[in-house]
Amino acid sequence: MISKLSKVPLFKRLIPSLSIRILKFFKKNRGYFKIKDFYMFLDFLDPIDREIILSQEYEKLEINFLLNQLNFFNANFFLDIGSNCGYYSMKIAIEFPEIKIFAFDPNKEACFKFGKTLEKNFKISQKIQLYNFGLSNLN
């Protein structure tokens, strides 16, 4: 219901503003949210997390492009570099049950949230390895 209302221009700005105030007041801005086929541990005060919660998707064009490429090349593994809350990894794990995913993010808070997401989605978590460090071509 909220995801549909958030597409109406007036509510698009009103819902996040009101929600942030309410959640701050009750100190309940973090928790598990059902995002289509899986649960994610998200923080409503984080702008990316908030977009995922309200729209039930994130970067739809990029995700579709990536899914098409993985399908075309019949990929066996996927490197999610800068995984943040794990949305890309979770979507890929759902779409490609046979693929192995290696997710990297140097941010401890992002890894904490992604780790909580993996705990809640045990079947999916078997395909994903999460690492709390960044990858770069520089030392």
Segments from the language model and where they lie:
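Phosphate/nucleotide-binding beta-alpha loop and adjacent structural elements of enzyme active sites
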Residues: M1-N139
